[in-house]
């Protein structure tokens, strides 16, 4: 059979490193995996207990609502009021998604079609590129990186784009670059969207992972933002529920309703016991994200300190669960994919090559803070030995 849409997909670069890691492990080599951003921290005991209780109730095994149960939508809007001072209507401005990734993908089907264009940061989380492409739209890349003014780059890309993009995709704190913005930036981008009649989609996956006094702003904190924007929030990192697949689309009521309508044709939502437990987690353990944040900060400090002792100076990120590291000068010519392969072979450490996040990621590797401090310390010792040996 001819799977034209599937056959058009390029090789998934990040899978190359995963394959090397698995091959090494089959040979008995202990590879420390800092490549895949797969949170290792468990959710709260209360959430797990509530899930177990809900699973035992026969009524909870029927189809759920694709929009999400009312109490869960109320819980997320209550969280936004407490956390960000944002008032949202749980009936019209909130829709539950099966994780932010599913929500974003289907949202692109709602907002874009053939002949449309979306502006996306480069580098970017892969679905931010492939979501618009799957919807039939074209991509306009906007350079994002150290010593880059993203807003100036966006203006330049806008002027060079015709037809004008219909959607701008944002995600701060940013994966993979860890770039952060303040509320003043959000105000500027909202003003731009109003002036140029473009719609904003903000993937707020790392809403609760800010360090050293930095508090990531919600785009919906800007007055009137819901006229031109929606935001995706997820429990994956904040509440350590990666495999539970609980996310939300929030903001513009017309767009939220459109996504809910599309989802009614595609799914029946997340398993209801998971929705019930997620509701309890947000309502009864509101400080849990602070505990998660503290763990990731300690891991960040351990990795940054260990890399420095290895002679690899990397700026400490203010947000996310990642470290975006420039390739050391002696290895720059290798490129990020070959350098990441070298780290697996010589240091027994897996990192994601920057090119896997688009051409704008070349010259960097991304480390995920998904191992405990002891394992991270061992990883940096391995890196130091390998880089010293290779000279």
Where are these regions (language model features)?
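N-terminal small-domain helix-loop-helix segment of the aminotransferase-like
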Residues: 2-99, 106, 282-284, 389-391
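Helix C-cap/helix->beta junction micro-motif
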Residues: 24-27, 135, 195-196, 310, ...
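PLP-dependent enzyme catalytic core of the Aspartate aminotransferase-like
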Residues: 78, 82, 86, 332-335, ...
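Conserved PLP-anchoring active-site segment centered on the Schiff-base-forming lysine
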Residues: 110-132
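Active-site phosphate-binding strand-loop segment of PLP-dependent enzymes
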Residues: 140, 144-213
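Conserved core segment of the aminotransferase class I/II
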Residues: 221-222, 226-297, 301-310, 386-388
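Conserved glycine-rich beta-strand-loop-beta hairpin in the small C-terminal domain of fold type I
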Residues: 279, 296-304, 314-327, 361
